[in-house]
């Protein structure tokens, strides 16, 4: 047993001091001197029975150290030289004694390069059937208690059967002990792999050691299980790696004295073998989802064979996975026929919507073909192009061609550019190949992520970026979609498809092939056709639409008039080539009609001078209309004649004082009869005419305009009018009265308001009559609240400016005012207030 322990001593290298620089003295355990004497006594006999250990010296020089700085290079040279010296000194003892009972030095933490620290070193290979030396320390601080003495006879592991077939080599010459042989040797510098697996040289003669897991328990100890070695595969470390080693009492937990590096190593290596998920190193531009390999028998010639992975391993080689995943869908590795097929698909597109729909269809089609390997076996030259014309309802309003770029895309006109390969797009690009010229994000369903949702071309349409809702391109695509729905019907994509009624034939009648095919075609035209917002963004303009309309209209050609009806208004050429509209100043016309009266007719063609009256005739007509109005008060006749006079002045371009007089006369007649529509039209024309032809009645009609704004409660125009009032206009009696009336109305001073109403100049009272009843209702509520319990009717009559008592009583009765039973001449304020509130 002691011989077995002696074989382990030459394979360990230990630093001296607190760090890799070897500073600080190290004290020797007295028990180790006895062990060395026992090892030296049996070195010759053991050396003859273990010939295979001679490989250790040869393989010790095969280290490939990944050293990046000068200090790490010095450490490599130091440990390599020290390791070779120890192998020469203890060449006949392949099993290190301190693997089972390690004795680290009293000192500081691990040197750089151990457990994830930069500057790792390769572990030397060992003969067949022998385990390499492993560091078993979690902490090397000086707080550890002394190491207990090792047992006398440890049980060695079973020897490989191949080692006994070789003749024993001659024993090496004795080597004098090293100067520091009394110190225990440190563990070998072994780089820590990110996957938790110790790398070994691929040139190792023993294939069993390539998948060797140093965390396995050795035979002869409690909890040992027979390891299963798998060549050319990596294994995840055992949960208890380095767990029971170190200078720690068995009764105390190992994590009590762990340093920070040991805790991180334990968290990374505590996962059991076989329970970790396969991890992939995603390339710079992922084209397909990871963790999807082709079956071995269906791979095309351009695909690399998938790397065999061990089911029990916790990770996969990042290089192999990245190269395999990138080669699956890189457009450079596509078959030439498939590239030409993609180019033909985009060439057949007529609009940007067709390109977007084609790109979405090709993404799912090519991805499914590349995954099942059929992309390298089918004939792409005979593959039919996708059908992009959607099924449109006969009741659906098709958008105009000029509106397609604005309605279908939310107002943003998109250019086509970005990631293209030749003349076709990269349909597996993660970002959209087309960008929005307006700067807004146009998210179409091109992202490979199945969990992200983007806004569709219509602002009310939503579509899933990872769903198989791209329509029927061919029978193979339809079958592949059916297989996906049957297999992944419980996934998120299928649930969202079922939620919007787009998962094949489900939700629209089972067992009907026609409806199933219609569903697939509806998916090609866009999801959510019946949703809120319509389908304006997904319709396409038919170039033959107008021709079809004309052909349908030709059925009634015999019933139409022989000559088309042409309206000649505004069709004559305007002078100076102006296209801003008809201006009567640019088309001077002098009338020749001598009729005093003329019916008013709207113009439907260019004015005829023979039907237009000149200005002298119009003056006579105005005098006749005034006389007829005073004698007959026929407003219909007067209004028709005044509008006829205004029309003749307009077509001749007459804007003189006579024009102002005509509009003022018409405004007064309309105001007297209460036609505020015609009055408002005349006021608008007078406001423009007063700038060119000032009149003595500017103040009068300015006051009418202010009172009219009070009637309409147009505070904005009223404020604007007050701003432009000059000092001369404010001094005008009509304007001054209108300003006082506005102030009383704005302040709610009803007493002053009705006093001004009774003193209104000229025709201002006609305008106030338009809203005086409204103001009387508000004033009556205020009176009833102020004069409880009763108020006389005479006071109300005088306060509200009624002309007589009968008119006041009629007004009060209409509002439901209650009078006191004892005195009918008084109003019951309490009861009347309630009736006014409810009315």
Curated annotation (Swiss-Prot):
InterPro entries: PCI_dom (IPR000717), SAC3/GANP/THP3 (IPR045107), SAC3/GANP/THP3_conserved (IPR005062)
Source domain of life: Eukaryota
Composition skew (Basic and acidic residues), residue ranges: 25-36, 492-508, 539-549
Gene Ontology cellular component annotations, sorted alphabetically: nucleus
Pfam families in the record: SAC3_GANP (PF03399)
Domain PCI: 675-839
Bias (Low complexity): 53-66, 120-132, 305-327, 429-450, 465-476
Region (Disordered): 1-75, 106-262, 287-332, 400-553
Biased composition annotated in UniProt, kind: Basic residues: 451-462
Comp. bias (Polar residues): 10-22, 40-52, 223-236, 253-262
Ranges of compositional bias, category Gly residues: 408-420
Record field: compositional bias (Pro residues): 145-189
UniProt-recorded name of the protein: Leukocyte receptor cluster member 8 homolog
Organism: Danio rerio (Zebrafish)
Lineage: Eukaryota, Metazoa, Chordata, Craniata, Vertebrata
């Amino acid at each position: 047993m002691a011989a077995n322990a002696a074989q382990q001593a030459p394979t360990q290298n230990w630093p001296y001091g607190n760090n890799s620089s070897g500073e600080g003295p190290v004290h020797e355990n007295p028990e180790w001197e006895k062990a060395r004497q026992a090892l030296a006594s049996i070195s010759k006999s053991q050396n003859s029975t273990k010939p295979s250990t001679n490989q250790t010296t040869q393989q010790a020089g095969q280290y490939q150290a990944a050293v990046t700085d000068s200090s790490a290079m010095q450490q490599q040279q130091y440990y390599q030289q020290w390791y070779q010296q120890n192998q020469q000194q203890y060449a006949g003892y392949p099993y290190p004694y301190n693997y089972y009972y390690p004795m680290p030095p009293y000192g500081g933490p691990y040197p750089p390069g151990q457990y994830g620290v930069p500057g790792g070193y390769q572990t030397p290979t060992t003969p067949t059937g022998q385990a390499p030396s492993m560091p078993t320390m979690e902490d090397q601080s000086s707080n550890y208690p002394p190491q207990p003495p090792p047992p006398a006879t440890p049980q060695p592991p079973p020897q490989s059967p191949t080692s006994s077939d070789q003749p024993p080599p001659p024993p090496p010459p004795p080597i004098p002990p090293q100067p520091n042989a009394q110190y225990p040797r440190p563990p070998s510098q072994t780089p820590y792999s990110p996957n938790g697996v110790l790398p070994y040289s691929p040139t190792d003669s023993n294939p069993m050691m390539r998948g060797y897991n140093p965390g396995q328990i050795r035979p002869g100890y409690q909890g040992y299980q027979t390891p299963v070695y798998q060549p050319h595969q990596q294994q995840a470390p055992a949960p208890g790696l380095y767990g029971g080693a170190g200078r720690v009492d068995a009764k105390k937990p190992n994590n009590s004295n762990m340093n920070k590096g040991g805790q991180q190593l334990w968290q990374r290596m505590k996962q059991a073998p076989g329970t970790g998920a396969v991890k992939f190193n995603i390339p710079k531009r992922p084209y397909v989802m990871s963790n999807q390999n082709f079956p071995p028998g269906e791979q095309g010639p351009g695909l690399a064979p998938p790397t065999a992975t061990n089911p029990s391993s916790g990770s996969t080689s990042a290089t192999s996975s990245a190269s395999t995943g990138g080669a699956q869908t890189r457009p450079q590795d596509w078959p030439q026929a498939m590239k030409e097929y993609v180019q033909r698909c985009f060439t057949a597109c007529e609009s940007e919507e067709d390109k977007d729909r084609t790109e979405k269809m090709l993404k799912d089609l090519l991805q499914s073909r590349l995954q099942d390997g059929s992309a390298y076996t089918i004939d792409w030259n005979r593959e039919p192009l996708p059908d992009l014309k959607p099924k449109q309802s006969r009741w659906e309003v098709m958008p105009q061609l000029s509106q397609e770029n604005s309605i279908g895309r939310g107002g943003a006109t998109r250019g086509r550019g970005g990631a293209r390969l030749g003349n076709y797009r990269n349909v597996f690009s993660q970002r959209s190949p087309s960008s929005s010229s307006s700067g807004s994000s146009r998210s179409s369903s091109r992202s490979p992520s199945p969990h992200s949702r983007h806004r569709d071309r219509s602002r009310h349409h939503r579509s899933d970026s990872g769903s198989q809702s791209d329509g029927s391109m061919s029978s193979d695509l339809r079958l592949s979609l059916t297989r996906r729905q049957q297999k992944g019907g419980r996934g998120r994509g299928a649930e969202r498809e079922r939620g919007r009624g787009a998962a094949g034939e489900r939700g629209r009648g089972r067992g009907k092939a026609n409806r199933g095919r219609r569903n697939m075609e509806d998916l090609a035209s866009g999801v959510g056709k019946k949703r809120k917002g319509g389908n304006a963004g997904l319709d396409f303009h038919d170039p033959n639409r107008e021709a079809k309309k004309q052909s349908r209209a030709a059925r009634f050609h015999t019933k139409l008039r022989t000559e088309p009806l042409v309206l000649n208004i505004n069709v004559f050429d305007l002078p100076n080539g102006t296209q801003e509209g008809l201006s009567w100043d640019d088309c001077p016309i002098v009338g020749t009609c001598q009729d005093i009266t003329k019916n008013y007719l709207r113009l439907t063609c260019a004015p005829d001078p023979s039907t237009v009256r000149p200005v002298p005739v119009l003056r006579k007509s105005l005098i006749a209309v005034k006389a007829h109005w005073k004698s007959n008060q026929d407003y219909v006749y007067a209004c028709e004649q005044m509008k006829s006079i205004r029309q003749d002045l307009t077509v001749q371009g007459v804007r003189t004082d006579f024009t102002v007089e005509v509009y003022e006369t018409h405004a007064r007649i309309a105001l007297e009869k209460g036609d505020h529509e015609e009055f408002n039209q005349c006021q608008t024309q007078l406001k423009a005419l007063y700038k060119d032809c000032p009149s003595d009645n500017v103040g009068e009609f300015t006051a009418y305009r202010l009172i009219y704004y009070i009637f309409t409660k147009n505070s904005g125009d009223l404020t604007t009018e007050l701003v432009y009032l000059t000092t001369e206009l404010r001094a005008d009696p009509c304007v001054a009265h209108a300003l006082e009336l506005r102030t009383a109305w704005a302040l709610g001073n009803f007493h002053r308001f009705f006093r001004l109403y009774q003193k209104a100049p000229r025709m201002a009272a006609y305008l106030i009559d338009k809203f005086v009843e409204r103001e009387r209702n508000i004033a009556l509520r205020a009176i009833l609240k102020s004069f409880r319990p009763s108020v006389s009717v005479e006071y109300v009559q005088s306060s509200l400016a009624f002309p007589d008592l009968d008119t006041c009583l009629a007004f009060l009765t209409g509002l439901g005012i209650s009078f006191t039973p004892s005195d009918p001449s008084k109003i019951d304020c309490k009861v009347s207030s309630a009736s006014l509130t409810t009315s």
